[in-house]
């Protein structure tokens, strides 16, 4: 029997990059504490990203309450869409989330060098129905290195630098650039810029055209719900912290 191709939709095999939240402990109180600690400095980093819960690292015989983990992720504004489990972990299908098959292609999420390794968030390819084209996945630099971006960043794209970040092209509305060090933007900033995300109060943001949705240093942020003054909006500026307050100052380039 042949099926006529529909002009309205089609179903076919495909894959989509998403995040895996890899669970390595059954102590949910400790997991919740570490999760909140990780995200409190950069609450916008994974906001509204889809994520699959990966329980393959648990020891034989261990199990966790997936409904509780699902709620934890919702609390930090992530969107759980499925579970990745071993064939022997039949209990993983009891949480009301679909079981997904992952093909490992890992990019480690940023973490402070002096921290013990908590449950990591990693990017992997997860089998799913093919959606509309998605923005490119997060790009993460090697520890301590300056990351240079010379292409425009579209809405939904995220860049994370473990050192300083230099951007040579526009950052569109809905795009997000994050650095543990300083951020230099030699183009319009219309999205979000977060510097010093692990508590570096000496970090600064330098920008040649400031039109942001959000700016932040060491977790202290400002949105443009309160309009920026005319003498800095669209102008070259530097942004720094002074006594826990963001200071936005004109940047003299000549």
UniProtKB/Swiss-Prot annotation:
Function: Cell division inhibitor that blocks the formation of polar Z ring septums. Rapidly oscillates between the poles of the cell to destabilize FtsZ filaments that have formed before they mature into polar Z rings. Prevents FtsZ polymerization.
Subunit structure: Interacts with MinD and FtsZ.
Top-rank lineage group of the source organism: Bacteria
Similarity comment text for this entry: Belongs to the MinC family.
Keyword Cell cycle: yes
Gene3D superfamilies: 2.160.20.70, 3.30.70.260
GO biological process, one term: regulation of cell division
Keyword Cell cycle: yes
InterPro entries: CAP/MinC_C, MinC, MinC_C_sf, MinC_N, Septum_form_inhib_MinC_C
Protein name: Probable septum site-determining protein MinC
Keywords: Cell cycle, Cell division, Septation
UniProt-listed SUPFAM superfamilies: Cell-division inhibitor MinC, C-terminal domain
């Amino acid at each position: 029997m042949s099926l006529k191709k529909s002009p309205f939709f089609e179903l076919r095999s495909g894959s989509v990059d998403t995040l895996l939240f890899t669970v390595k402990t059954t102590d949910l109180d400790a997991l919740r504490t570490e999760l909140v600690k990780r995200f409190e400095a950069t609450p916008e980093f994974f906001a509204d990203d889809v994520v699959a819960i990966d329980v393959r690292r648990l020891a034989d015989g261990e199990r966790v309450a997936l409904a509780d983990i699902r709620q934890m992720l919702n609390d930090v504004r992530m969107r759980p869409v499925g579970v990745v489990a071993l064939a022997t972990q039949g209990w993983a299908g009891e949480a009301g989330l679909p079981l997904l098959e992952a093909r490992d292609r890992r990019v480690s999420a940023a973490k402070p060098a002096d921290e013990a390794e908590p449950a990591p968030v990693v990017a992997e390819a997860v089998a799913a129905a093919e959606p509309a084209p998605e923005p490119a996945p997060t790009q993460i630099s090697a520890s301590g290195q300056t990351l240079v971006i010379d292409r425009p960043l579209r809405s939904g794209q995220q860049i994370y630098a473990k050192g300083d970040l230099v951007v040579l092209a526009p950052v569109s509305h809905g795009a997000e650039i994050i650095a543990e060090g300083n951020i230099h933007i030699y183009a319009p900033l219309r999205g979000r810029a977060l510097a010093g995300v692990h508590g570096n109060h000496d970090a600064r943001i330098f920008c040649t055209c400031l039109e942001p949705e959000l700016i932040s240093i060491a977790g202290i942020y400002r949105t443009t719900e309160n309009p920026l003054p005319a003498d800095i909006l669209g102008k070259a500026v530097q942004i720094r912290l002074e006594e826990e307050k963001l200071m936005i100052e004109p940047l003299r380039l000549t």
